[in-house]
Amino acid sequence: MRMMYIDGGKELIRLLKAVHEMGVAVSVDMAMFEESTEAGLQDWNELLKSVIPYIDFFVPSVEELCIMLERDCYHEWNERSQGADVTNFLDIEKDVRPLADRLLSYGAKVILIKCGTPGIYFRTADKEQILKIGGGIGEEIADSWSNQEAFEKSYLVEKDKVASGTGAGDTTIAAFLSAILAGKDWQDALHLATATGALCVQTYDALSGIIPLEDVQKKIDAGWEKKKINFFQLIVFLKNF
């Protein structure tokens, strides 16, 4: 993966640009790095500014995104959490939304920021940008997808049923993309995504918890409760949503 970030991400830009020009929708996730490594010493802010225009669905974790765009802020988050899970101490309005704002200014179209146990933050660009998604999505869908913002809380999983977090983020995004390909609207896609992530954490590996989207929907329809997130600062956000 080293070739994807050296030289200002030149190889990654070349690859994404080529795929984008083929009219294919592109989804990109990120990976965490140690600050002292070669990857950690790259100018990720400039790299993302260069590659974002060629990405249709950008789906990083909030920690990955912050360490790339706002290193000092990332350090402050860790001090705030005192060694606990950072995502349990974040404020959407103050911590998460500004990162999405930055991505939109770089030309992002659809943003999903994985926020750990609390859930996922969803944000989209205006209609002009949404219409640029590879493969074309049409005027009607573009209208319903443009200028959207939401925080989708995780589904409740009892503590004694949590086995491992392995693959939870990846399966969440896979379910979201699969739901879109199946013709679901963004709201239903978010429900299916968070539900799939919740199923994943109930197994020790990344794949055993995966079930067909139709079966995931049945669990949701049966009244699966959402996680109660008292510590996650949603009040200001929800007032503006």
Q: How would you label these PLM feature ranges?
A:
Residues 69, 180-181, 200-201, 220:
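Hydrophobic residues in alpha-helical segments
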Residues 67, 162-185, 190:
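Short, small-residue alpha-helix embedded
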Residues 188-192, 208-211:
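Alpha-helix N-cap and coil->helix boundary residues
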Residues 114-117, 165-167, 195:
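Short glycine/serine/threonine-biased micro-segments
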Residues 1-160, 207, 211-223, 227-241:
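Ribokinase/PfkB-type carbohydrate-kinase core domain
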Residues 199-208:
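Short arginine-rich
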Residues 191-200:
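An active-site-proximal "capping" alpha-helix that borders the catalytic cofactor pocket
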